[in-house]
Every structure is written in structure tokens, then in C-alpha cells.
Amino acid sequence: MLAAAALQSAFTSCPGRIGRGSVYWPSSVTLVLQDSSDYLLTLAPYLLGRVRRGVVGSSRYAKRLREQIRLAAADSAGRAVLISGEPGLEKDNLAALIHFGSAARRQWLVRLDGATLRADGANLFGQSGSDGDWSLLECLGDGALLIDKLDQVQPSLQLSLLELARTGHWSCPGEGSRPRHFGGRVFFTAEAALPAFDQVCDLIRVPPLRVRR
């Protein structure tokens, strides 16, 4: 029952992925249906299925923000994106606008709260000794990863995320874990400055709502 409920929740939150009698599984997942369901169960608690709203306002700040989102969505290289700004600006929604406006819109988008991530990255990369099998990143395949509140991530994990954004490489915690490659796009949001990430990400600085009208 729990599995069925999780699958139903994921389907209803991602209506664009479900056609008439068919589910648009990520292209990198070439498993049988049961394994595909297991992948989805891993992702279901984190899926973002739709955009809540667009960017409103007629000011030059709002127009510039819309243009930045358009350019990021059109980026064929799929560079990592860092969206920064003060609290309450729905920066995660802007990441969703970019993803669902891009050519990769049929891929999954998952969101993780940086404040809740373990320092060793097990939430993302899998438990020590698992070699990354059935980790969230493996299940995500070529989907998009959003780390919300990157500035609240533990410094040791920030280094791993920096490498993920720069090269796409990641590995499971623990010795002897083989390196893997993430084929999807990475989004970050933050309230504080993160100079190291400025070097490897496209930057979108979100103006306050009070100047965007």
C-alpha cells in the first residue's frame, strides 16, 4: 500500500510525464518495469512536478530575471545554475521554471533541502559500502538535481557538490568506491555568497520582490 501511494503521489505531481497509458521514464533508465518502479519510489519524496508560478512584474528587474531564466533554459550545455537571493523569493520555483522550460523537461526534477543533508552525502550518494547502488543520484539518471539552501550544506559536502557541478563526477562515501558520472543538470539555491561555486555555475541573482513590480 505504501509503495502504491508513493507511486500515485509521484504520478499526480508529474502530470507531464504520463501519456495515454504510458509513462515517460527517464531515457537513462533501461530496466524492467519493477526496477523502474523501485527507482521512482526512491525519487518520489523529492520530486518537483510543476512550476508554481512565473515571474511577475513589468520593471526592468523582472524583465531581466525572465531573460536570465530563458537563457538558462536554452543552454544546450546544461551548465550548473546557482540562484541566489534573500529569503522568501521562491528560488526553487525559478529552478523549476528553468528545468521545465528546457529541452530536458521530460526528465525528473528532484529537490533536496541542503540543511538536512548528511555531511558524508549519504542522502545523495548512498550509504558507505553500497558503491552508490540505488542511491538517489543513480536513480535520478539524466534527471535534474536541485540542492536548496546550498549555504546550509556542511562544508565537506559542499566540496563534493562543487565537484559534481564542475565535472559531474561523484562517488559513494567510503574507501574503494568507484567514481561515477551524473548526466543530469544541477541547480543550487542560496542566500549567502558562495564564491567557489561562482566559478563553475551560471549565476542568477534574484532581486527582491519590492523592486520587481
What is the predicted function of each stretch?
Residues 51-52, 58-62, 91, 121, ...:
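The cytosolic transmitter module of two-component sensor histidine kinases
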Residues 54, 68-127, 138-144, 149-152, ...:
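Conserved post-Walker A coupling segment in P-loop NTPases
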Residues 156-181, 191, 209:
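Conserved catalytic/switch belt of AAA+ P-loop NTPases
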